[in-house]
Curated annotation (Swiss-Prot):
Pfam families: Thymidylat_synt. This is Thymidylate synthase. Homodimer. Pathway: Pyrimidine metabolism; dTTP biosynthesis. Its main location: cytoplasm. GO terms for biological process: dTMP biosynthetic process; dTTP biosynthetic process; methylation. The lineage of its organism: Bacteria, Bacillati, Bacillota, Clostridia, Eubacteriales.
Length: 263
């Protein structure tokens, strides 16, 4: 069994059994637990679910859209057959002053790469998407809003802080795509991938996702081993990565589980 299936499903079960039944801004009630944490050694295993199919290529495209393209254009994603931001697209075809727009405005990727190469013991290395003056000019506040970076013994470690974690849909995407980001940055800075810690402040399951999570829990004992992540070893510039340079090898998984997104 993959370590991610084990940790993810344990928290899913805990939320279903012990979560607080709560209202929220979407109007769809949730079962929620605060302060859930998962940690992975990326040298040993790539974290992705096998107890259901995760659209890895879509997750990679979104990741590159945010951090490489530094874009807020939903139409750019649509041109790649990615529709996960359609519900939040504004009249101008963007998501306003959020995600990639914030990365670009504050030159956050270039500053991080420079620090990783030239001052790896810096304790101030982070990417912060929670920029208060720009929150209200976007249709959705960033969910995954902070990454903190550390280099120890030649290994790149990352902590991802997520204010709100949709356990059925968002969290599996976010864990895998930010684990990819660690690998990409490690490769272009001459480091090895190390620890990846995913902290979710509000971990929740929407009531219309309960049956889907219960179905997934029945597959726990039939989970597969984690796949291997392949990254094109020829790429040394972060901005040269394309989705074709990032692949999973031997990704065995169960069938998809349809769940509704709450807007």
């Amino acid at each position: 069994m993959s370590l991610y299936d084990d940790k993810y499903l344990a928290i899913a079960n805990d939320i279903l059994e012990n979560g607080y039944f709560d209202n929220n801004r979407t109007g769809v009630k949730t079962y929620k637990l605060p302060h859930q944490i998962m940690q992975f050694n990326l040298e040993k295993e790539f974290p992705i679910l096998t107890t259901k199919f995760v659209a890895f290529k879509t997750a990679v495209k979104e990741l590159l859209w945010i951090f490489k393209d530094q874009s807020n254009s939903v139409k750019e994603l649509q041109s790649q057959n990615v529709k996960i931001w359609d519900e939040w697209m504004m009249e101008d075809g963007t998501i306003g002053t959020s995600y990639g727009w914030i990365v670009k405005k504050f030159d956050q990727i270039d500053k991080l790469i420079d620090a990783l190469k030239n001052n790896p013991q810096d304790r101030r290395m982070m990417i912060n998407l929670w920029q208060i003056p720009y929150l209200d000019s976007a249709p959705l506040y960033p969910c995954c809003f902070l990454t903190m970076w550390d280099v120890t013994d030649g290994k790149l470690n990352c902590m991802l802080v997520q204010r709100s974690g949709d356990w059925g849909l968002g969290v599996p995407f976010n864990t895998s795509q930010y684990a990819v980001l660690v690998h990409l940055l490690a490769q272009v800075t001459g480091l090895k991938p190390g620890l990846f810690t995913h902290v979710i402040n509000n971990a929740h399951i929407y009531e219309n996702q309960v049956d889907g999570l219960k179905l997934q829990l029945t597959r726990k004992n039939d989970a597969y081993n984690a796949p291997k992540l392949w990254i094109n070893p020829e790429i040394t510039n972060f901005y040269d990565f394309t989705p074709d340079d990032i692949k999973l090898e031997d990704y065995k998984h169960h069938e998809s589980i349809k769940m509704d997104v709450s807007v």
